[in-house]
Amino acid sequence: MSKSRLTVFSFVRRFLLRLMVVLAVFWGGGIALFSVAPVPFSAVMVERQVSAWLYGNFRYVAHSDWVSMDQISPWMGLAVIAAEDQKFPEHWGFDVASIEKALAHNERNENRIRGASTISQQTAKNLFLWDGRSWVRKGLEAGLTLGIETVWSKKRILTVYLNIAEFGDGVFGVEAAAQRYFHKPASKLTRSEAALLAAVLPNPLRFKVSSPSGYVRSRQAWILRQMYQLGGEPFMQQHQLD
């Protein structure tokens, strides 16, 4: 290898190491800060806003209103757990059984990819990382998930998740969603309304709360059944999530 190539390789290596240190400090500081402080915006919100500007859409505003868990209907927390991650109170950030099922499904159906992200993983991804699929992003997501599971309580993870989840075009967080679609605060959401909001979470830009498709309605009904099977509101109290 020539001297010039060695110099370039050395420069790139030093740059990447320094970048990793900077990112580790940034993300570590964010995990510590947001364990107690409200989250003003997420990486997904920034990505959506910048993308809109780049496409010349200056009317788009990624909007979110932070609310604490006691300002959110307990039905909402139960609905997203029923829909997205029923083992949320038990695991340490990863649902191994669901991951194995998703991998087996994806091997058989390459054109219909199924995910297995827990609420903790989704929170880490939405808060700190860019959208998309890559092994690098998945690796970073795993590290950040372990970080928030170590530092935050389950109640804090759920609170942040509900405040940064995307519920529609420019609608982030359950308070903004409740006001936009039901003209009420998140604390007043009914069981059915909470299930409808949770039903669009797999793809909130495709599935609409304002005009739910037959699939969304069937998913809403399934979520309501799962909420009942989990035990209703006592489930949240039992796991200290309310």
Curated annotation (Swiss-Prot):
Its main location: membrane. The chain crosses the membrane at residues 19-39. It is a single-pass membrane protein. InterPro entries: Glyco_trans_51 (IPR001264), Lysozyme-like_dom_sf (IPR023346), PBP_transglycosylase (IPR036950), Pep_trsgly (IPR011812). SUPFAM superfamilies: Lysozyme-like (SSF53955). Keywords: Cell inner membrane, Cell membrane, Cell shape, Cell wall biogenesis/degradation, Glycosyltransferase, Membrane, Peptidoglycan synthesis, Transferase, Transmembrane, Transmembrane helix. GO terms for biological process: cell wall organization; peptidoglycan biosynthetic process; regulation of cell shape. Its EC number is 2.4.99.28. Gene3D superfamilies: Biosynthetic peptidoglycan transglycosylase-like. It catalyses: [GlcNAc-(1->4)-Mur2Ac(oyl-L-Ala-gamma-D-Glu-L-Lys-D-Ala-D-Ala)](n)-di-trans,octa-cis-undecaprenyl diphosphate + beta-D-GlcNAc-(1->4)-Mur2Ac(oyl-L-Ala-gamma-D-Glu-L-Lys-D-Ala-D-Ala)-di-trans,octa-cis-undecaprenyl diphosphate = [GlcNAc-(1->4)-Mur2Ac(oyl-L-Ala-gamma-D-Glu-L-Lys-D-Ala-D-Ala)](n+1)-di-trans,octa-cis-undecaprenyl diphosphate + di-trans,octa-cis-undecaprenyl diphosphate + H(+). It is found in: Cell inner membrane. Pathway: Cell wall biogenesis; peptidoglycan biosynthesis. GO terms for cellular component: peptidoglycan-based cell wall; plasma membrane. It comes from the Bacteria. Belongs to the glycosyltransferase 51 family. Peptidoglycan polymerase that catalyzes glycan chain elongation from lipid-linked precursors. This is Biosynthetic peptidoglycan transglycosylase. It comes from Escherichia coli (strain 55989 / EAEC). The lineage of its organism: Bacteria, Pseudomonadati, Pseudomonadota, Gammaproteobacteria, Enterobacterales.
